[in-house]
Amino acid sequence: KVDGEYKRFAFTEDGISPRSRLGLDNGVFWNTGDESDEFGHITEDPQVRIQMMDKRMSRLDLVTKRVPDDEQVVSFGVHDYTIISWGSTKGPILDAISILKKEGINIGFIQIKLIHPFPSDYVKSLLKNAKTIIDIEANHSGQLGKIFKQNVLREIDYFILKYTGRGMTSTEIYDSLKKIVENNANKREVLSHGA
């Protein structure tokens, strides 16, 4: 039971407001797409807007403090050649680097799981000995590569991208990585395998 009026968006020390559970007495609140006060009522008051935005942004610091490094970024080893990626590319990347390892070619891989706030210091520490950074993504523009460059202040050496709407395969990643290791690759490799 909530005593008094429930403030769904109450200002708190850590920036996280208490949540109501279904059926909680006096736990009714409003959600809007516009700025709201602590009760969820729409407001255009500039001071409330400033307080609410400051509250939201304070959570970014909280995330950095509370989420362990190994949950922000997963390292599958770092070598001279190291891949950065995110999302659905993980499986085919691990398969491709496993095949390459059997051929005596070691390629590292770090999977970025937290994009904002970007774990810059941790990523920098992981990649300090990597000589070549390869960005593998399922989009046209290499979005993670841009975020990486902005936060880590380091260039991506090679992009392997696929944006056909089909998933990447370990075979096409393997082929692209092999070209990079053999110094026979374009800076931007666009994949198109798949029916």
What residues fall within each predicted segment?
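Flexible, low-complexity linker and terminal segments
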Residues: 1-195
